[in-house]
């Protein structure tokens, strides 16, 4: 049953014309809090913000958004949003797990979270990823040796660059059974080592983050 205007006033209800202003105040307060610190939002807030569907599946219903460091002189910046508990770096999201699985089980687990085993394409990315890891564990990468093609390949089909590698000294050994790659902590640094794919290791999953630009002057 709809309330008449007089009833709304007597009951302290909001006049319909005030509702947009209240929504605006709530939105401004929300965004101000986000600008001060990392912001946790829902998938649906970002659908409204961007006006389009995100890359995330319904598996990830809550996201953490961070504002990337703006360029000197810039008036705005870029928000990168990742599922809660994932870490953002250069528009991608990363999640490390220590429980042991085989390489194929690890990739299936990542796929179930709309991601893949991690690809590493730069030294900066290698440095970031290794900050997430526990030195007591080793972690599968999304890199494996395809005997038919006779070369290393990333699981997400990212081109493999032989000039951007971080092999342990003496690796890879090109053993018949060591067709998968793990990150291992050896002599005070994280390095790549080829391992049998049926060994059980931890894993690192990676997926593209959701990004949108923010400009306070607009």
Swiss-Prot record:
Calcium-dependent lectin that acts as a pattern recognition receptor (PRR) of the innate immune system: recognizes damage-associated molecular patterns (DAMPs) of pathogen-associated molecular patterns (PAMPs) of bacteria and fungi. The PAMPs include alpha-mannans on C.albicans hypheas and mycobacterial trehalose 6,6'-dimycolate (TDM). Interacts with signaling adapter Fc receptor gamma chain/FCER1G, likely via CLEC4E, to form a functional complex in myeloid cells. GO terms for molecular function: carbohydrate binding; D-mannose binding; immunoglobulin receptor binding; metal ion binding; pattern recognition receptor activity. Residues 89-206 form the C-type lectin domain. It is found in: Cell membrane. Expressed in myeloid cells (dendritic cells, macrophages and neutrophils) and B-cells. Its main location: membrane. Keywords: Adaptive immunity, Calcium, Cell membrane, Disulfide bond, Glycoprotein, Immunity, Innate immunity, Lectin, Membrane, Metal-binding, Receptor, Signal-anchor, Transmembrane, Transmembrane helix. It comes from Rattus norvegicus. GO terms for cellular component: external side of plasma membrane; plasma membrane. The chain crosses the membrane at residues 25-47. Residues 48-218 are extracellular. Residues 1-24 are cytoplasmic. Pfam families: Lectin_C (PF00059). The gene is Clec4d. Ca(2+) binds at residues 171, 193-194. This is C-type lectin domain family 4 member D. Heterodimer with CLEC4E; disulfide-linked. CLEC4E acts as a bridge for interaction between CLEC4D and FCER1G to form a functional complex. Heterodimer with CLEC6A; this heterodimer forms a pattern recognition receptor (PRR) against fungal infection. Glycans are attached at residues 100, 109. One of its GO terms (biological process) is positive regulation of myeloid dendritic cell activation. It is a single-pass type II membrane protein. Disulfide bonds join 82-93, 110-205, 180-197.
């Amino acid at each position: 049953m709809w309330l008449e205007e007089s009833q709304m006033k007597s009951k302290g209800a909001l006049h319909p014309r005030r509702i947009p202003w209240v929504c605006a105040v709530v939105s401004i307060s929300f965004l101000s809090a986000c600008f001060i610190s990392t912001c946790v939002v829902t998938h649906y807030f970002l659908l409204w913000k961007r006006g389009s569907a995100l890359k995330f599946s319904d598996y990830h219903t809550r996201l953490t958004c961070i504002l990337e460091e703006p360029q000197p002189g810039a008036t705005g910046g870029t928000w990168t949003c990742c599922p809660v508990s994932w870490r953002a770096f250069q528009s991608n999201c990363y999640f490390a797990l220590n429980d042991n699985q085989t390489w194929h089980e690890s990739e299936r687990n990542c796929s179930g979270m709309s991601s893949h085993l991690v690809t590493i394409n730069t030294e900066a990315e290698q440095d970031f990823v290794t900050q997430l890891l526990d030195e007591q564990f080793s972690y599968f990468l999304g890199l494996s040796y395809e005997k038919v093609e006779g070369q290393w390949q990333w699981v997400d089909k990212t081109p493999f660059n032989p000039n951007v590698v971080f092999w342990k000294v003496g690796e890879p050994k090109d053993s018949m059974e060591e067709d998968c790659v793990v990150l291992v902590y050896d002599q005070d640094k994280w390095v790549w080592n080829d391992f049998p794919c049926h060994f059980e290791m931890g894993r690192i999953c990676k997926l593209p983050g959701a990004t949108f630009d923010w400009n306070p002057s607009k």
